[in-house]
Amino acid sequence: MLIIELLKAIFFGIIEGITEWLPVSSTGHLILVQEFIRLNQDKAFIEMFNIVIQLGAIIAVMLIYFERLNPFQPGKTAREVQLTWQLWLKVVIACIPSILIAVPLDNWFEAHFYFMVPIAIALIVYGIAFIWIEKQNAQQEPAVTDLARMSYKTAFFIGCFQVLSIVPGTSRSGATILGAIILGTSRTVAADFTFFLAIPTMFGYSGLKAVKFFLDGHHLDFAQVLILLVASLTAFVVSLLAIRFLTHYVKKHDFTIFGKYRIVLGSLLLIYSFFKFVF
């Protein structure tokens, strides 16, 4: 029944809206949830769906930060316009590693790592990394506390960290936030740049998935279009809340709690995978 499929779409949109911005892996969570709750659709659509619904989350970022990211915003001084263009240049530079590395390898990683065990391992490994890095940085003052002071070189290396998220379970936001902190930025700068970098990255990735879907000879029927729209709209609404939560959270807290969550979830998934294999 279509109504059941739409309810599932709403649920997946909620998962996407929350996990896209928290450093816990949205694609990984969607793949895991679909182990238990699946859309009654073909595999090609589901694989495309998992990526394309990110567009709703991206539009939420664009809405929240529209004035900050718009160089043509009325009332901006010449200096503010210059800084906005510089920010966009940093974002473009940070996209280069993904274009050169992640895009060509995407199909290979999709074929070999989109399974529960690799996702569980990635959750645990990056969970440990979050805890360890936060512990190492506890007594250190960040060198970069303002995006305007972040160098183009730092932006490029943050983009290199983003490439790590090609492995499901890693988390794009988690990889870039970790990388930014390692490179000396404050948590606030790390989170903000992660949000901004998501715009071209996820628009591009979603576009590639959609184009590949159609080039492979697939098409969308009315029900599938509706499922995509409902899931994306839900992801948009939930993302508005998740982004505001994270921007306030990082001002007073570190990311240790997310590291612990990743380790617990990854461990449970390994146990589940073991029993599923045995029994």
UniProtKB/Swiss-Prot annotation:
Membrane-protein topology: Multi-pass membrane protein
Protein location: Cell membrane
Protein name (record): Undecaprenyl-diphosphatase
Superkingdom as given in the UniProt entry: Bacteria
Keywords: Antibiotic resistance, Cell membrane, Cell shape, Cell wall biogenesis/degradation, Hydrolase, Membrane, Peptidoglycan synthesis, Transmembrane, Transmembrane helix
EC number(s) from the headed UniProt entry: 3.6.1.27
Transmembrane feature ranges: 2-22, 44-64, 85-105, 113-133, 163-183, 188-208, 223-243, 255-275
Organism: Streptococcus pyogenes serotype M12 (strain MGAS2096)
Other observations noted: Bacitracin is thought to be involved in the inhibition of peptidoglycan synthesis by sequestering undecaprenyl diphosphate, thereby reducing the pool of lipid carrier available.
